């Protein structure tokens, strides 16, 4: 950990001491999916991300809480002591749990426990890829706890059809509290035009995993800093602005790269300046 912070500090100095400047765009809410730093504990992750001026983080279920609590994962099974420790970490680093996922309830009991868990942290958005027969259950508890449930999708496969914008859009018409969670990277990996997906879900987007890639349709593609790939991120931002989207723009890296922390900070800068 002692080796990471000086590197981040140096990079911040190189960029002008902060990710903010006079050209920043203040209306975008920017978060980082903590899976991007899955090799670290959540405590370390929050310390790394704190200087970047984020609005929050999207926590994923299986990350270890702290080296001092190696058996604690970010799940509803956390004890009160563990939860209090995490709440103190959020306060210390001036961050919050903006969203939680990707998670699977698996049953009504599981859905209820997840909703109770995130509400305890003041989180308002759950990201799930649960099976379709559980969507009415998610709607029930989202209404009870004042949450938005955003349906995620991975690459095009046989698990579900959530990657199909027209199909998901039709499903979402049945629910008030359930929306879509477009993952720009997974759409590109599947050869699905991200802009089409965003337009098809217009007004029904609860969260976005915002990414860029060096090639479109490459199933083995990797993320690159926003604005440095071939995806038209600026046009997608304009489309989301047109829709009046007010949710989080969640930065996520799913592969380990040597420049990971620097790349994440570049993504934050891009979202602040465009």
Question: Language-model segments: which ranges?
Answer:
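Bacterial Sec-dependent N-terminal signal peptides
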Residues: 1-25
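Histidine-acidic metal/acid-base catalytic patches
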Residues: 18-34, 38-56, 92, 108, ...
């Amino acid at each position: 950990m002692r080796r990471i912070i000086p590197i981040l500090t140096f990079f911040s100095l190189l960029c002008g001491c902060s990710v903010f400047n006079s050209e920043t765009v203040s209306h975008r809410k920017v978060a980082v999916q903590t899976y991007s730093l899955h090799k670290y504990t959540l405590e370390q992750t929050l310390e790394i991300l704190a200087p970047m001026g984020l609005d929050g983080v999207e926590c994923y279920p299986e990350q270890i809480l702290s080296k001092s609590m190696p058996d604690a994962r970010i799940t509803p099974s956390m004890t009160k002591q563990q939860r209090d420790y995490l709440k103190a970490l959020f306060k210390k680093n001036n961050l919050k749990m903006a969203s939680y996922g990707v998670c699977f309830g698996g049953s009504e009991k599981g859905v209820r426990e997840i909703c109770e868990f995130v509400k305890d942290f003041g989180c308002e958005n759950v990201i799930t890829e649960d099976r379709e027969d559980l969507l009415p259950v998610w709607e029930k508890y989202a209404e009870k706890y004042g949450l938005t449930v955003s349906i995620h999708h991975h690459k095009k496969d046989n698990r579900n059809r959530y990657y199909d914008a027209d199909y998901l859009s039709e499903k979402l018409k049945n629910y008030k509290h359930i929306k879509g969670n477009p993952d720009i990277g997974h759409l590109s990996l599947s050869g699905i035009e991200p802009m089409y997906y965003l337009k098809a879900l217009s007004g029904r987007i609860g969260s976005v995993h915002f990414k860029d890639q060096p090639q479109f349709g490459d199933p083995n593609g990797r993320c690159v800093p926003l604005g440095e790939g071939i995806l038209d991120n600026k046009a997608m931002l304009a489309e989301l602005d047109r829709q009046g989207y007010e949710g989080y723009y969640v930065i996520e890296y799913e592969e380990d790269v040597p420049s990971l922390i620097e790349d994440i900070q570049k993504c934050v800068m891009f979202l602040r300046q465009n």
